[in-house]
Amino acid sequence: MNYESLIFDIDGTLWDSRALVAEGYNIQLNKEGLSRYCITAETLKPLFGRVMTEIADVLFADFPEKERYALMARCMETENRHLHENPCHIGYPGVRETMEELAKTHRLFIVSNSQQGYPELCISKLGLTGCITGHLCFGDTGTSKGKTIRALMEKYHITSCAYIGDTQGDY
């Protein structure tokens, strides 16, 4: 089937940001005197693909819910800054070239379980600004990936699409 639009996941599909995300979290945790929490790329591996509140529930389970989510929000702010400032290339080989080719015949979109600002960072860091028609994330909708995809489809009047992701939870 020929699809009019293609919707992409970010983490594990377009890039691998786990190491930089872990660094960003640790910067914030150390700043707050919480160095006993040492987040690694391996710590994040089974958590990527989940919504941010679920990640906070796992990483910071010993905090009361309100404090846990506030800490997670601060970690995500630091993560976004760290990703933005770090010159490291974390995109998978050939992603930009592939997306440029696909954009010639399809409208391309991004959907993520991430916080606001993360899709924009991905688009910018990978040089995809001219390729991506639009994006939505958990931070925009506060809901599941499936519902976020549906919201994106409605917003951009998408009638025929394929979703490309890397985990079963993406589908």
Give the role of each language-model region.
Residues 109, 116-162, 168-171:
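Substrate-recognition "cap/lid" segment bordering the active-site pocket of phosphatases
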Residues 17, 165-166:
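Acidic di-acidic motifs
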Residues 3-10, 14-93:
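N-terminal helical cap/lid subdomain that shapes the substrate entry/recognition surface
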Residues 38-41, 92, 96, 143-146, ...:
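Structural motif corresponding to alpha-helix initiation and N-cap regions
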